[in-house]
Structure formats: structure tokens, C-alpha cells
Design a protein with these regions (language model features):
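Beta-rich nucleic-acid/ligand-interaction surfaces
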Residues: 43-46, 219-221, 294-296, 490, ...
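A carboxyl-terminal module marker
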Residues: 3, 23, 473-480, 619, ...
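Extended, well-folded interaction surfaces typified by the phenylalanyl-tRNA synthetase beta subunit core
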Residues: 197, 448-616, 836-838, 843-844, ...
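Glycine/proline-enriched, intrinsically flexible loops and inter-domain linkers
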Residues: 3-6, 12, 24-26, 41, ...
């Protein structure tokens, strides 16, 4: 999330003297920018400027060359010789760029660097090293560890460098002693990913004077229309999007401006380098740093190309099947036909060479190098959905894509290019072009018809019309009208999230103050149904029972894709045909809504196991989405009038069925090793126990039906899974997951699971109070019945036969033994049951129990079962 530096913020808004980061966080949270963390420095001094008096190379036996240096760190920190004179400190340094005459950053004994690395005098390579000359990485300023920091090359002007004296405080010089505020930005407020946006919000919170930097920059940007005859723009730009996502062309504005005669040896100024590093970015080169700086300051992602390597026209198009790209980070990517690309046209072949994935990351060809003298600045506006999908598809969450997918100001491009050009001129001696190219098909924003009364109706705020108008104007809206309490409001270009009246109500409430919204308790109804519905009560009972069983409730995103289908061995093509596809998925690799909760719950279990959590047992209650390909098409509703009942009914008929399910996954140990005994791993019986607990809690009568192995769904173990039945209604599955599922997800062996359709289960319940069965006072009759039966007959089938034959006199039945062996013969097994008979109105005689026994034996014989002696 964005870092906020008060010194940088001052460029755009008046900040009171002595403003603390704690107070800044309080001011910003008032307008919805939450504090994530205030980062304090991990570095403590003393850290000072040092002057290298001499550096003597000393070859070592291992081939390494170290430098024995004497570094002047000022009288306060220099060593004292035997005569009481101040002399430079002796320091060992292995950096290849160490040289006499340089000014460096010296960490002295007592200093602490990131990672709790303490600097102390130590004997090494035959010398006492009394300090350390530091690199960027060691100070937490960046990733560069190729050598120590040479202040001469660190972006200081000659005058600033000359003023640096041995012993000067480098903590303050490099801003190592300053904290930073990290803020949390919601996805709809992408404009706050810039200092321009944060400064505007600080103005809204405090009333401080704010100056939009884009206004002046936009006025200075050269005109792109009506160029004199014979004068060409910097480069031709063509947008040729033949595969737009949802009909939205991927690029509606592309602004290109050249800067020629750039000095590639120019260094990034110290102030810019410092700001970039504090924002969490590496300083690479002046040209790249300028584009990153403009992005952080204004919010417009930019890219710099080597103009001499590019051949026009630039073509913005979708990728072709089979195209590949190596991005700036050196990784190879197989491109999708949905990827929007920036290409050029070598040898007149239009759009034949890929320069980068638009709005995500550039490719290796055309990048700015240490030899680049002519630069082409790209400042564009891309479709949010297209960029988001590409970034997720290729797993490149770049700073540019984070901004584009949240929405970038579509009028900012000339101003951003102007700012970048000015910086390249000032610090790189370049010459900006006055003939940029501006491909612009941006449409004007649609005005929103807004009733002032909506603020009171929706937010409960008693706000007068003038205040509402002032607030909307202050956030950048153009407000017209006001008669009859209605406004015509045109949102600003940097707020693509403002599209409906409710969005404007939210803005008014946010800036008036959420603390001003009155707290009211809705009155409870005095007539009709009060409290939770029967379904809500049962859902709560299910959740309580599983929690009491020791499972933890979770809530997962309901999105699935090819990887999930593969993990559970599902037929992806067949499943997709009956699944709901999302028009704008959060993740491009999971564009479908789940048909089973277990698929998304498995993602959560997997994440916990990968983070070292053991014995994970989670459950989730939520909806699944069952698409019917034969359902009628969902009609388009009128936008200006209230839909009719018939239209709403047609809309409802086209929606997928959305039953409520509960699913659970149990992994690891059911019982850990201890003084009471050895560990017991989770197995199918633990999942069955969970289902039985649910059944008992809600008063349902659930039975298990073990299907034949070939009929078991692919994700379940063929011999350790059962269908859960409520009478004749199938309501779910329970058992162990298939070994291939455990292997694919990294689950422990024998991991168990269950999933029940609660909507179907609740429908089988009467809703009437559970009637307790009277306890009989007559004695029971207990018998053991052992049957020899074919191995094809399941224990559940035989048990069902016994129950039906015994009738109401049967009180309980338990399978207590399964035996196979040579004594029985091939293809046979023995199933032994303990049964209890009891009558409600009399004592069972021996004749009664014998009659029951005979009915059972006769019924079992129909399955080929014989009673063993």
C-alpha cells in the first residue's frame, strides 16, 4: 500500500509546522484513508559522513582483495593516538569501488542496522576495523550491494557535495531517522495511490490549501492538434483492438512525447532518489526514476522507450495465439489473446514486434539503457479489466498495474508527460519535443441526476443543499442546477468510481464525517414474525455444533477455475458448462462461481498448511451456484422506469439456483500423542461424526448409503465415502478425500471431508417441535446376529434389510465385526451385528424374539445372506 512522506506531501498542500505522522494518520482516516502502519526507522546511529584519507589494497590467500582504509569521520568520532591527537579511524572495506578521496557513509560502533545488525570494533584480516563503510542494502535504502555508497555519485549537486564535511550526520542527510505512514486504499479509490490524491484528501479533512499540480502542467503541455503543414508528430500511434473485453477497447488514450539529446551519464538527483527509496522503489537510472517519480506524484503510470530502437507506428493490439515476451525482470511469458500489447513496426510490418504488456510491464527490447540518448515517453490510459487480468494471469503485480486496475485519470496524460519532460531536461540536459502524439477517444463523463434528499434518505444526514453542492464541487465535480432539490453532477476525470447517486451520497457522508451519522436502533416489530426464521436458527445450530466439535469457521471467496478442477479431478469442460462465469473476475485464473464449497474451502486449508499450521479442521457455510444451461436468458431491464412484476419474474427465472451448503475438511491428527496414548490421525470416521452431530442437533434423521466404487465422485475415496441421505433425498457426501486430491493439494494422507446441501436438508424437516420418544420400562432382549454374505453386498445394505424386517421392536443395531478368511470361502465375508429388541407395551417373550429373528433371517436370505451358527 502507498507510503506517505510528509516532506513530499508539502509539495501539493499546506502542512502545519511540526505535523506528526500520528496526527497525519488521524487526519486521513477521517476521510476514509485508513492507517496501515507507521514505519519507524530500523537504523540507529551514530552514522556519519566520512572522508577516505587512504585505501591500501591487501590481497588475501583466498584471492579476495580487501582495503585497509583510514577514514576521517570528524573530530568528534575520530580515534585518539598515543599522543592525544585525533586521527582517522581504521576500517576494513571489501567493496571494489572504495578509493581514497571519496566521501562515504560510515556506521560507527554502537550503530544498529536493519536486521538488528550491531556495529562493533572487531579484528579481521589482521586489523582492528573500527566501523563500517555502508552500502545501500546495509542501510535499508535499496537492493544495491555491489559497492559502498559514494556520495559523489549519490545525486548531490556539486555545491551540496562540497558542503559535506567529515562527521556530518548521515542519518538526517539520508533521511534514515524519519518515519513513514503506510495507508490502506480501497479498490475504488485509485486516485489516492498518488501524492496528488493524498494531498487532496488531506485538504478535504483539514481544509488546508491544496494546489493540483496537474492544472499548471496541463497548461504547459504542447498542443497536439493543428500541427503546421509538413510537421510530423513524434511517432504515429494506432490502436487496433480486435478482441476487446466486454466490448471495451483496451486503450482510449495514448500520449507519446519525445525527449532528444538526453545525457545517459546523468545521475538521479539525491532528493528524487531519496523519495523513491522511501516510497519502496529502487533507483535505477535517471530516465526510469523520472517515470516512477511522476507515477508516485501524479498517479499516472509511465514508460520510457529508447526512441532510436523503435520503428513506427506504435500499435496497441491484443496478443496473437502463441506469442511470447521476455519482460524487464527477465521472465518469459506465454501471452494470452486477452493480453493488450504495445508493439512497434520494424521493416514496415505493422505491430509485429512486442515491446511490452500494456499497463503491466515492458519487454527487454526498447528499454532505456546506459547508451540511450533519445527517449520516447509513454503516458496512456488503459482499460481496468484488461490490465487486471493480464497482471494476475502473468503474476506481475507491478506498481503500474495496481494503479491502472483501480482506475487512472483519463485527462492526466499530457500533464504527466510534461512533468517527466521537464525533469529530464533539468537533470538530463534533454530537449523536449513540441510535437507529441495524442491518440484520444476518451468519452465525456455522463452527468448524474442527483436529488439532495438522497443524503438524508440513505445516510440519515440533515445536510442543506448549499453544503452538498460545496462538497461535490470540492471533490472536483461540476455541479449544475439545484432547482427542486435536484443537481446535475458530472464527476471529475480522476474519480471513475462515481457513477450513481449512491456514490455521491457516500462522498457527502465521508466529508461531512461518518461520526456525524446519527445512531438509531430500528424498532422491533410488534406484530407478525419476530426474531430469526427457522432456517436461520438451523443454520446457527449447524455452525455452533461444528464449532463445539472443534472445527473453525472460515469464509472463502466463491471463485474457482481450472486449477481447482484439476486438483479435484473434475471434468473441467463439463463443469464449466453448468457453472456461472463472472464477467469481471477478481482473478483471471478463477473466473467461475463454485458449485461445491469444498473446492474453495480447500484453498483456505492449503494456505494454512503451507504456513505451517498443523491439524487444520475448517468448515464453511455459504451458497453454491448451480447454472442451468437451459434456463431462459436474463432479460435487459429498462434503466429509466420501474421494472414490471413480469420483468422481475423473468429476471428471477434466469438466475442460477443458489442453495446453501455446509462443508468441512479435517486434516492432521484427531488426537495428538500424549501421556494418555499415541496419536490418531484423522480419517473418514471423524467426518461421519461431524455429520451425525449436525443430524442430532437439528433433529434430522440422516443415513449413510455407500455407493459402488465406480459410482463414487472422483474427488472422494472410492472405498471410504458415502452418500448422506435424508429419507429418500440425497443431501451430500462424507468420507475421505481421494489420495490424488490430497497429493495435489499437499494435504496429509486420509484427510476427510463432508459437504451437505442445507437447503435440501432443511426442506425435509417438518418445522414442528421434536417429539421425544417415551422410554420403555420393559426389559430389552439383546442378540448377536452374524451373517455370511457375498463381498458384493455392503454392510449398509444388510443393515437396512435387518431394520426393515425387525420393525418397531428394534431399538438399536451396531456392526461390531467384519471377517473374511479361508474358512468362509472365496467371495464371502461375515458381518456381525449386535441388536437390541424392546417393546413399548409388554415384555418380549422368547416366542416374540424368535419371530423377529426369523423375519430378519428370511429377509436377509433375499440378499444371499445366511445366518452363521
Amino acid at each position: 500500500m502507498p507510503m506517505v512522506d510528509i516532506d513530499w506531501l508539502k509539495d501539493h498542500v499546506e502542512v502545519p509546522e511540526g505535523l506528526t505522522y500520528e496526527q497525519l494518520a488521524k487526519d486521513l482516516v477521517k476521510v476514509g484513508l485508513e492507517e496501515e502502519e507507521i514505519h519507524t526507522s530500523q537504523v540507529t546511529g551514530p552514522i556519519v559522513v566520512g572522508y577516505v584519507v587512504d585505501a591500501t589494497p591487501e590481497p588475501q590467500k583466498n584471492g579476495k582483495i580487501i582495503n585497509w582504509c583510514h577514514v576521517d569521520v570528524g573530530d568528534e568520532y575520530n580515534e585518539t593516538d598515543e599522543n592525544g591527537n585525533k586521527v582517522p579511524r581504521g576500517i576494513i572495506c571489501g567493496a571494489p569501488n572504495m578509493a581514497a578521496g571519496e566521501k562515504v557513509v560510515v556506521t560507527l560502533p554502537g550503530a544498529v542496522l536493519p536486521g538488528d545488525f550491531k556495529i562493533e570494533p572487531r579484528k579481521t584480516y589482521g586489523h582492528i576495523s573500527n566501523g563500517m563503510c555502508a552500502s545501500e542494502r546495509e542501510l535499508g535504502l535499496g537492493d544495491n550491494h555491489d559497492g559502498i555508497i559514494l556520495l559523489r555519485k549519490y545525486g548531490f549537486t556539486p555545491e551540496e557535495y562540497e558542503k559535506l564535511q567529515p562527521g556530518d550526520d548521515a542519518m538526517h542527510l539520508l533521511h534514515l531517522d524519519q518515519p513513514l505512514l503506510e495507508i490502506n486504499i480501497t479498490p475504488d479509490r485509485g486516485y489516492a495511490f498518488s501524492y496528488r490524491g493524498v494531498a487532496r484528501e488531506y485538504h478535504h479533512s483539514t481544509g488546508a490549501v491544496y494546489t493540483d499540480p496537474a492544472t499548471a502542467l496541463g497548461k504547459k503541455a504542447p498542443v497536439t492538434q493543428g500541427l503546421p503543414e509538413g510537421v510530423k508528430s513524434d511517432i504515429e500511434v494506432i490502436v487496433d483492438d480486435k478482441n476487446p473485453i466486454h466490448g471495451v477497447v483496451g486503450c482510449d488514450r495514448y500520449y507519446a512525447r519525445a525527449v532528444r539529446g538526453f545525457d545517459p551519464a546523468s545521475h538521479t538527483p539525491n532528493w528524487m532518489r531519496r523519495r523513491l527509496i522511501r516510497a519502496g522503489m529502487r533507483s535505477i537510472s535517471l530516465a526510469v526514476d523520472v517515470t516512477n517519480y511522476v507515477m508516485l506524484d501524479l498517479g499516472q503510470p509511465m514508460h520510457a522507450y529508447d526512441l532510436d530502437k523503435i520503428e513506427g507506428p506504435i500499435v496497441v493490439r491484443r496478443a496473437n495465439e502463441g506469442e511470447k515476451l521476455t519482460t524487464l525482470d527477465g521472465k518469459d511469458h506465454d501471452l494470452s489473446v486477452e493480453d493488450l500489447l504495445i508493439t512497434d513496426s520494424p521493416n514496415g510490418e505493422r505491430g509485429s514486434r512486442v515491446l511490452g504488456i500494456a499497463g503491466v510491464m515492458g519487454g527487454l527490447y526498447g528499454e532505456v539503457t546506459a547508451e540511450t540518448k533519445n527517449i520516447l515517453l509513454e503516458s496512456a490510459h488503459f482499460d481496468q479489466v484488461s490490465i487486471a487480468r493480464s497482471a494476475r494471469r502473468h503474476k506481475i503485480p507491478s506498481e503500474a498495474s495496481r494503479r491502472f486496475e483501480r482506475g487512472v485519470d483519463d485527462q492526466l496524460q499530457p500533464a504527466a508527460a510534461q512533468m517527466a519532460a521537464e525533469l529530464l531536461v533539468k537533470y538530463g540536459n534533454g530537449e523536449p519535443s513540441e510535437h507529441p502524439t495524442d491518440y484520444n477517444t476518451v468519452c465525456n463523463r455522463r452527468p448524474i441526476l442527483f436529488k439532495a434528499s438522497e443524503v438524508a434518505r440513505v445516510a440519515g444526514l440533515d445536510t442543506d443543499m448549499n453544503t452538498i453542492s460545496d462538497i461535490l464541487t470540492d471533490i472536483g465535480c461540476t455541479v449544475a442546477g439545484g432547482g427542486n432539490g435536484e443537481f446535475s453532477v458530472t464527476p471529475p476525470s480522476w474519480r471513475p468510481d462515481l457513477n450513481e447517486p449512491c456514490d455521491l451520497v457516500e462522498e457527502v457522508a465521508r466529508l461531512v464525517g461518518y461520526d456525524e451519522i446519527p445512531v438509531t436502533v430500528p424498532p422491533a416489530p410488534v406484530e407478525g414474525k419476530v426474531g430469526l426464521t427457522a432456517e436461520q436458527l438451523r443454520k446457527r445450530q449447524v455452525a455452533d455444533e461444528l464449532a463445539e466439535y472443534g472445527m473453525v469457521e472460515t469464509l472463502s471467496y466463491p471463485f474457482v477455475g481450472d486449477e481447482d478442477y484439476k486438483n479435484f479431478a473434475l471434468d473441467a469442460d463439463a463443469t464449466k458448462k453448468v457453472s456461472v462465469e463472472i464477467a469481471n473476475p477478481l482473478a483471471g485464473d478463477r473466473p467461475f462461481l463454485r458449485r461445491d464449497i469444498i473446492l474453495t474451502l480447500a484453498q483456505t486449508v492449503q494456505r494454512n498448511l503451507r504456513r505451517g499450521v498443523e491439524n487444520v479442521s475448517l468448515y464453511e457455510i455459504g451458497h453454491v451456484y448451480l447454472w442451468d444451461p437451459n434456463a431462459p436468458a436474463i432479460p435487459a431491464l429498462p434503466g429509466a422506469v420501474k421494472p414490471t412484476d413480469e420483468q422481475l419474474a423473468a429476471l428471477d427465472a434466469g438466475l442460477p439456483d443458489q442453495p446453501m451448503h455446509v462443508a468441512g475438511i479435517l486434516t492432521g491428527n484427531a488426537v495428538d500423542s500424549g501421556w494418555m496414548g499415541d496419536r490418531r490421525a484423522v480419517d473418514w470416521s471423524d467426518a461421519v461424526e461431524a455429520v451425525q452431530r449436525i443430524s442430532d442437533r437439528i433433529g434430522a434423521k440422516l443415513t449413510l448409503d455407500q455407493p459402488k466404487a465406480e459410482d463414487v465422485p472422483a474427488q472422494w475415496h472410492p472405498g471410504r465415502a458415502a452418500r448422506v441421505m435424508a429419507g429418500d433425498t440425497f443431501v451430500g457426501m462424507v468420507g475421505e478425500l481421494h489420495p490424488h486430491v490430497n497429493e495435489a493439494l499437499g494435504f496429509p494422507a486420509h484427510s476427510a471431508a463432508f459437504e451437505l446441501n442445507l437447503t435440501a436438508l432443511f426442506a425435509t424437516l417438518s418445522g414442528k417441535p421434536v417429539q421425544a420418544k417415551p422410554i420403555s420400562t420393559f426389559p430389552p432382549v439383546k442378540q448377536d446376529l452374524a451373517f455370511t454374505v457375498s463381498t458384493d453386498v455392503t454392510a449398509a445394505e444388510l443393515e437396512k434389510t435387518i431394520v426393515e424386517a425387525a420393525g418397531n421392536s428394534l431399538e438399536s443395531i451396531d456392526l461390531f465385526d467384519v471377517y473374511t478368511g479361508d474358512q468362509l470361502g472365496e467371495g464371502l465375508k461375515s458381518l456381525a451385528y449386535a441388536v437390541t429388541f424392546r417393546a413399548e407395551d409388554k415384555t418380549l417373550t422368547s416366542e416374540d424374539s424368535e419371530a423377529i429373528r426369523k423375519r430378519i433371517v428370511d429377509a436377509a436370505a433375499k440378499l444371499g445372506a445366511q445366518l452363521r451358527a
